[in-house]
Amino acid sequence: MTDGLVRLRLDLSYDGTPFAGWARQPGQRTVQGDVEDALMRVARLPAVRLTVAGRTDSGVHAVGQVAHVDLPDDVPLGGLARRLNGVLDRAVRIIGLAPAPPGFDARFSALSRRYVYRITDAPYGAEPLRRFDTLAWPRPLDVPAMAAAALFLVGEHDFAAFCRRREGATTVRTLLRLDVLRRPEGVVVADVEADAFCHSMVRALVGALLAVGEGRKPPQWPAAVLHRGVRDPAVTVAPAHGLTLVDVRYPPDPELAARAEVTRAVRIPPTPSG
């Protein structure tokens, strides 16, 4: 850490409904923009920059988002989270705020991100209090078939067929878990964890599983799409509002810096020469 600065870890929860995603964009309301503006106001700083574990898309929620920010070490930290929550819209809450351990990087130190996607196939749709975080599906879903299809996708693969490509960036990811189950209240939940996700990957995976769940495709189909390595027009990206980032996992503090170094080497595209 540069002399004169302190790195803070922020744990955040937000309703993604009113936001055009996490990342600051000109002319758009975003979670990053709201939190950075609140930090500048409360800490009386001309500029701040947040680094986040998971850049959620427009309409995606979070209950376990993690970010870091570097602030001058003379900024009073006592009551900072309370003061931030006092100026932030109620759609965003700072759940925790504390000095980060040495070597911590919210993005690159992370071991994994975990998302949950909620679906209801009840004939009456989503419960009124859950309509903003649960997809109402109009047809019955075969959850055992969806769960069987999910098993073929777990592991290290090139997920290019389920990602929007970014020039120079890898689409190889390690999918640690993709569990699909029906909870006692009837809601179908896809529980997804990976070392990292490329753009639209979780929602594309859910879209493929929905095609299996309603019987349009066999359980082996998502894996066949995966191995072909190109987008299939039959894979629809599931709507954003059913998706919530629930957890970001980190190694023990002494391993944070080493993890960040390894991840940077894999995730950052090389700078073009010439």
Swiss-Prot record:
Any one biological process term the GO annotation gives: tRNA pseudouridine synthesis
User: What is the protein name given in its UniProt record?
Assistant: tRNA pseudouridine synthase A
The protein's annotated catalytic reaction(s) are: uridine(38/39/40) in tRNA = pseudouridine(38/39/40) in tRNA
Q: Which NCBIfam families match?
A: hisT_truA
MF annotations from Gene Ontology:
RNA binding; tRNA pseudouridine(38-40) synthase activity
Keyword Cell inner membrane in record? no
Subunit-structure text: Homodimer.
UniProt EC number? 5.4.99.12
Q: Would I find Membrane among this entry's keywords? A: no
Residues annotated as catalytic = 57 (nucleophile)
Similarity-based family: Belongs to the tRNA pseudouridine synthase TruA family.
InterPro entries under this entry?
Answer: PsdUridine_synth_cat_dom_sf, PsdUridine_synth_TruA, PsdUridine_synth_TruA_a/b_dom, PsdUridine_synth_TruA_C, TruA/RsuA/RluB/E/F_N
Organism domain of life: Bacteria
| Job of this protein | Formation of pseudouridine at positions 38, 39 and 40 in the anticodon stem and loop of transfer RNAs.
Q: Which keywords does UniProt give here?
A: Isomerase, tRNA processing
